[in-house]
From Swiss-Prot:
Entry GO terms, CC: plasma membrane
GO molecular function per UniProt: manganese ion transmembrane transporter activity
Membrane topology: Multi-pass membrane protein
Gene name in the database record: mntP
Signal sequence coordinates: none
The protein's role, per its UniProt record: Probably functions as a manganese efflux pump.
Transmembrane segments: 3-23, 41-61, 62-82, 106-128, 143-163, 168-188
InterPro entries in UniProt: Mntp/YtaF (IPR003810), Put_MntP (IPR022929)
HAMAP family named among the record's database cross-references: MntP_pump (MF_01521)
Protein name: Putative manganese efflux pump MntP
Family that this chain belongs to: Belongs to the MntP (TC 9.B.29) family.
Keywords on record: Cell inner membrane, Cell membrane, Ion transport, Manganese, Membrane, Transmembrane, Transmembrane helix, Transport
Entry superkingdom: Bacteria
Compartmental location: Cell inner membrane
């Protein structure tokens, strides 16, 4: 996977966390940068670990399904991307409207884990491709740190406008990467 695909994957994977951070920022009363950075660090750390876990699981099975690798990566990315697009169009109840001043650590960890499960599945798919998983996981984690921090700071301003669209955009990026993987297999 080339560097542009890695960057697209990293920011595509960060969109769930970005959307969640917008929601978290929207519920806080004047979030401070330190709170946004704390959220970004938690989300980024977990989002770095989950593709590594998925990749490890995928490597255990790689000897059995190596000839299907492009189809597995394509299917996982299209499935996850499609799920993100569908979730982006769903109407979900808003979080509690009462302003808060800080989110609890375990609430953030739980949210980060929930938004990073797709990164674990992508890690499984990446096990069947020739990628530097450490660099890819770090790129995903850094993109998530950046996007989550930004999402928290601007959440209360753009939450009603962009919140779900961020998830839709992330899903479209994942579907595009899946298509690129399949195309590169058949083209070359």
């Amino acid at each position: 996977m080339n560097i542009s695909a890695t960057i697209l994957l990293a920011f595509g994977m960060s969109m769930d966390a970005f959307a969640a951070s917008i929601g978290k920022g929207a519920t806080l009363h004047k979030p401070k940068f330190s709170e946004a950075l704390r959220t970004g660090l938690i989300f980024g750390a977990i989002e770095t670990l989950t593709p590594l876990i998925g990749w490890s699981l995928g490597m255990l099975a790689s000897q059995f399904i190596l000839e299907w690798n492009h189809w597995i990566a394509f299917t996982l990315l299209v499935f996850l991307g499609g799920r993100m697009v569908i979730e982006g169009f769903r109407n979900t109840p808003d979080e509690d409207d009462a302003p808060q001043y800080r989110h609890g650590f375990w609430i953030l960890v739980t949210t980060a884990i929930a938004t990073s499960l797709d990164a674990m599945a992508v890690g499984v798919g990446l096990a069947f491709l020739q990628v530097n998983i450490i660099a890819t996981a770090l790129a995903i984690g850094c993109a998530t740190l950046i996007m989550s921090t930004i999402g928290m700071m601007v959440g209360r301003f753009i939450g009603p406008l962009l919140g779900k669209r961020a998830e839709i955009l992330g899903g479209i990026v994942l579907i595009g990467i899946g298509g690129q993987i399949l195309w590169s297999h058949f083209a070359g």
